[in-house]
Amino acid sequence: MLLLQFHDHGPRVGRLELDGKVRLLRDCTSTYDLAVEVITKRRCLAEVVEERTDNAQFDYERLLIERRLLPPLQHPDSAHCFVTGTGLTHLGSADTRNSMHKKVSGDIESLTDSMKMFRLGLEGGKPKDAKPGVQPEWFYKGDGSILRGCGQPLVMPDFSQDGGEEPEIAGLYVIGPDGTPFRLGFALANEFSDHIMERQNYLWLAHSKLRQCAVGPALLVGALPDHVEGISRVRATDERVRWQKPFLSGEANMSHHIANLEYHHFKYALFRRPGDVHIHVFGTATLSFADGIRVEPGEVFEIEAAAFGKPLRNALAVEAPPHSAVVPL
């Protein structure tokens, strides 16, 4: 089941059908309000969607062309949405996997911090018992103000050295009144970052992640398939494919259980504040930057996986953010 948020004389929520039509959900203007209602009434999200599905239809292609799609989950107050993520969690392609195993097979003291973290995940990211596994790398991207929907530009501040894509899957969550995290489902995400800054010094990773993040276009309700295979592309301004590469996700291609990544995020009381929204990305092993690609303004990132329907498309833009010097009081 795939859900969409879009504009039509105000915000709307629709269910994507196999014929490409979007059927409106009655009495529903946001997936956030829908989730809060489902949590409060202790219902099943998929069942409520079935009950609310109306005969009113919209054309998905037209919504895409007219850029009327919104991120699939938002909080009405962007300060109450956390956008965060984990890295070094994916095994990647067979070549990447073999390469990684060779790099981490030596003496632990000779490994870089990144390879140590990857090795920890291989050894303890999927515990056999009910105990928590090893904690992953973790980072903060921003609040809800950085979220962008399909068709909206990803804006790189002019002080950045790079604006590159990271094709990922995100978990989408709302915190219940007793602090319980409830997962609505999953969505494609472009965890947009400055890879040159990160490469210059790994301690600048936190800086490099403070960028916008595209999510959508659709929310996949329910479980994530164990194996997700997609394509990440960079299109030139004339729509020519300049670079493309498959990417893999799902637990079969990860060194951590998703439940383990969720545990190590939500174990902090700060992230269990009732009513808050969390968009948490799970990592990737595929980057155009790793192949020497520098994306130029106006070029388009395109991330696609069959389980999520239409691709997530966002053009790169650059702007000078406003800056004011600090004034002492």
Regions found by a protein language model. Give the residues of each.
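Catalytic-pocket segment enriched in acidic/His residues
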Residues: 8-10, 187-189, 193-329
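Active-site microenvironments in enzyme catalytic cores
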Residues: 4, 8, 40-236
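N-terminal cap/recognition module
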Residues: 18-51
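Surface loops and adjacent helix of pleckstrin homology
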Residues: 27, 93, 306
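Short, exposed beta-strand "edge-strand" segments with a Pro/Gly-rich flavor and a Y/T-containing core
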Residues: 21-31, 54-58, 178, 216-218, ...
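Helix N-terminus capping/helix-initiation residues
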Residues: 30, 59, 85, 151, ...
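N-terminal basic/disordered segments at the start of proteins
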Residues: 1-18
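Short, conserved beta-strand segments within well-ordered enzyme catalytic domains
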Residues: 15, 24, 80-82
